[in-house]
UniProtKB/Swiss-Prot annotation:
It catalyses: tRNA(Thr) + L-threonine + ATP = L-threonyl-tRNA(Thr) + AMP + diphosphate + H(+). This is Threonine--tRNA ligase. The keyword Secreted does not apply. The gene is thrS. Zn(2+) binds at residues 323, 374, 502. Keywords: Aminoacyl-tRNA synthetase, ATP-binding, Cytoplasm, Ligase, Metal-binding, Nucleotide-binding, Protein biosynthesis, RNA-binding, tRNA-binding, Zinc. GO terms for cellular component: cytoplasm. Homodimer. Belongs to the class-II aminoacyl-tRNA synthetase family. GO terms for molecular function: ATP binding; metal ion binding; threonine-tRNA ligase activity; tRNA binding. Signal peptide: none annotated. Its main location: cytoplasm. Its EC number is 6.1.1.3. It comes from Tropheryma whipplei (strain TW08/27).
Length: 640
């Protein structure tokens, strides 16, 4: 019996799970097994829908551009893409033509039919597809080809080398898809390889869901941190410095300083000790840590120095990570179990040679400052430390205004290319899963997503427009304690290897800056705002009154000033609304008499005749409590 028979009458089922394997409905069900259905509107169903849509995209491209060569075409979080080698770049007009062809293919109801083939047959059928041949040659698993079969004639209309699974036919894709944009990429992300055209698309289970997504995309353009960074004078990425190297301006520097100061304070409260390490080091350190072997392609090339003291000199590298330095701090003296857990933190700047095509504003840069920490724990305290690190993560992100999360648990696959024993991996994975479940947050599995040196937890945070960002990682490391010979003395006087945990709660300050800028659409909460209070006199006669009042904020380190410009008051107000100032104060004759001010908020609401003491208390409370204030209602809530 196959899946079609088993789920007959279920038009919403598009694939199945059997023995933890995703299968097409055409696959035979092993005797005695009961498959689970995958509905089209489920997360896995949408993944399959998008994967099948990628195949239709490739079929459409090759039917229009006969010389196009196929790369890869996976599904993504909200859509899909496919890479093509073509003679001329695609244009927006090209995408419209391709999308029309896709709809024609979808409506023709071609069947997706999978066939397992041997290597010789795969080579023969893809002899004119050099990139597919490369994939075939690198594949050790079962080789399978998907054929698109004409509904009327039964002839093969198109084929792709693919693991699957796929929808039963193109008809299941429906009309809720769209091609969104195109970019240039290198094959396999390597600049030594040919350049290709990557066509992106999105696909959903309904037209309503598609519209909702496209609306969010348009909203995302409005809050793009690169756009807002320029408009609000926060940062720039000058060509004179180089790709992925950010320059924070005065206002952006204030925001970043506030971010760092508060994070540092919270780390100290949580028992972390801050250390500092240099930006460069000799080659030997990264050979010892394994970074040159495992991470060398993402490191900047070496600098040959010290030829005056050694004829050959030494290779120095910009550091891509802080962890080897922290392990040297640990090993700098004998350690006892009484000193553990040892929590070493550093806001350390690292340098990674990201491909120029992967660089994206502050979200993906070459020079980044991590809120990095490494915890060295005993086996007995490991679970408690991971739990504390996760709780600290959720609490700290919440203080910055992110409060919706899910957790991804990355485990190893069956490749065997991992450090540490099976027992260690099983133990560590069990602990991470237990801590994640105990947190009460939704969890998702990421099989095969672990690094070679240990499993990890990733905290995914939801922003104001519904996007999830990978924020924090808590990563176990079986590698560095072994490579650096780290030991501590236990109660019995025996030497034991510590368990090492990497964790970065923001990922990097640059990326977190980008996330917060988009989350708040540039209207940062008052405690982060570069300018917090601006006072506008109706006439010059009201300046001394406002100067006296504004001076009170200085004692609380609140960024407040009086506007002395001669422009009309409405024009000034419009200007500060555009600059997203949280508190704009206005004072006229009646305010001088009554010791009041008018306070205006970002949404245009205001409070008139507000006693200055009440105004002062409300602004101070808003900043002290790290509350977002956009409206009069928000302000009233802190006064209660």
């Amino acid at each position: 019996m196959d899946g079609f028979e088993f789920f007959s009458g279920r038009s919403d089922v598009v694939a199945m799970i059997c023995d933890d394997r995703l299968l097409d409905l055409s696959e035979s069900i092993p005797s005695g097994k009961v498959p689970e259905p995958i509905e089209l509107d489920s997360p896995r169903g949408l993944d399959i829908l998008r994967h099948s849509c990628a195949h239709v995209l490739a079929q459409a491209v090759q039917s229009i551009y006969g010389d196009a060569k196929l790369g890869i075409g996976p599904f993504t979080e909200n859509g899909f893409y496919y890479d093509f080698s073509v003679n001329e770049p695609f244009s927006s007009d090209s995408l419209r033509v391709i999308e029309d062809k896709m709809r024609e293919i979808v409506h023709s109801d071609q069947k997706f039919v999978r066939k397992v083939v041997d290597r010789q047959s795969a080579h023969s059928q893809f002899r004119d597809e050099p990139f597919k041949l490369e994939i075939i040659n690198a594949t050790d698993d079962t080789l399978s080809i998907y054929y698109n079969i004409d509904a009327d004639s039964g002839s093969v209309r198109w084929m792709d080398f693919c693991r699957g699974p796929h929808l039963p036919s193109t008809r299941f894709i429906g009309d809720a898809f769209a091609l969104t944009h195109v970019s240039s990429v290198y094959w396999r992300g390597n600049s030594d390889n040919p350049q290709m055209q990557r066509v992106y698309g999105t696909a959903w289970g309904s037209a309503k869901d598609l519209k909702g997504y496209l609306d969010r995309v348009e909203l995302a353009k409005l809050v793009d941190h690169r756009k807002l960074g320029k408009e609000l004078d926060l940062f720039s990425l000058p060509d004179e410095i180089g790709p992925g190297l950010a320059l924070f301006h005065v206002k952006g520097g204030i925001i970043r300083s506030e971010m760092e100061q508060y994070a540092r304070l919270r780390h100290l409260e949580e028992g972390y000790n801050f250390v500092y390490s240099p930006h460069i080091t000799k080659r030997d350190l990264f050979e010892r840590s394994g970074h040159l072997q495992w991470y060398g392609q993402s490191m900047f090339p070496p600098m040959r120095l010290d030829k005056d003291s050694c004829s050959q000199g030494f290779d120095y590298y910009l550091k891509p990570m802080n962890c080897p330095f922290h392990s040297l701090v640990f090993s700098s003296q004998p350690r006892s179990y009484r000193q553990l857990p040892l929590r070493l933190a550093e806001f350390g700047t690292v340098y990674r040679y990201e491909q120029s095509g992967a660089i994206h504003g502050l979200a993906r840069v070459r020079g980044l400052t991590q809120d990095d920490a490494h915890i060295y724990a005993t086996r007995e305290s490991f679970e408690d430390e991971v739990s504390k690190a996760l709780q600290f993560t959720i609490s700290l992100l919440g203080d910055y205004g992110l409060d919706q999360f899910y957790i991804e648990i990355s485990t190893r696959d069956a490749s065997g290319k991992f450090l540490g024993s099976d027992e260690d991996w099983a133990y560590a994975t069990h602990i991470l899963q237990k801590v994640a479940q105990d947190s009460g947050l939704q969890t998702r599995d990421d099989p095969g997503g672990a690094a070679f040196y240990g499993p990890k937890i990733s905290v995914q945070a939801k922003d104001a427009i519904g996007r999830y960002w990978q924020m924090s990682t808590i990563q176990l490391d079986f590698n560095l304690p072994e490579r650096f010979g780290l030991f501590y003395t236990d109660r019995a006087g025996e030497r034991k290897r510590p368990i090492m945990v990497h964790r970065a709660l923001f990922g990097s300050f640059e990326r977190f800056f980008a996330v917060l800028t988009e989350h708040y659409a540039g209207a940062f909460p008052p405690w982060l705002s570069p300018e917090q209070v601006v006072a506008l006199p109706v006439t010059s006669a009201h300046i001394p009154y406002l100067e006296e009042f504004v001076s009170r904020f200085s004692s609380r380190l609140i960024r407040a000033r009086v506007d002395y410009m001669q422009d009309r008051l409405p024009k000034k107000i419009r200007s500060y609304v555009k600059e997203k100032i949280p508190f704009v104060l206005v004072a006229g004759d009646r305010d001088l008499t009554n010791r009041t001010v008018a306070i205006r908020f970002r949404d245009g609401t205001q409070i008139s005749d507000l006693p200055i003491q009440k105004c002062f208390d409300g602004i101070c409370a808003s900043i002290d409590r790290k509350k977002q204030i956009q409206t009069r209602i928000d302000f009233d809530s802190v006064l209660e």
